[in-house]
Amino acid sequence: GGNARSWVQLKPELPQMADEKGIIFVCPDGKNSWYWDSPENPAYRYETFVTSELVKYTDGNYATIPDRKARAISGLSMGGHGALWSAIRHKDVFGAAGSMSGGVDIRPFPQNWEMNKQLGEFAANKASWDAHTVVNQLDKIVNGDLALIIDCGEADFFLEVNKDLHNRLLARKIDHDFITRPGGHTGTYWNNSIDYHVLFFDKFFKK
């Protein structure tokens, strides 16, 4: 798993990119939360933290533009799920969102990454798992609500769930950038992904 330093470790030039683009990068530590407000663990309120508390703190302490049109959210792996989860459910807060190698459908992986601590065991809590996966949140948005970029490596174990998300977005006629490139669930892949996401968000901010 990653932590608050992961992006800078993957992309040491991130501070220079921030200066060049005039972008503030805020990197919270999501632990193993999947960025949910956990129905099983009341101590885990990461959706509230990221979409409300952290946004208010950042706007109150840094020279931000406090508007959804100047705010984007992205992440890798669990964070890719978290970014889309947060933006789709809080499109009043974020104007753009991205996922790199995101676990956008958690249900094929019921024994992985301590998700059962947040949602309960899959077999006994299928409805909760269905309700807490990104691919089942798309009814909350229509085309134009969010600028979306989604990418995943062709050797990544999350590739198929990302293709499914892409097809569901197409079926709903929701515009999005969808990229697959050679690579796996690795830092080398994400180092390049960050470049694409920053470019995408920079163009969004300048609209």
Regions found by a protein language model. Name each.
Residues G1-K207:
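Non-catalytic cap/lid and distal C-terminal segments of serine-dependent acyl enzymes
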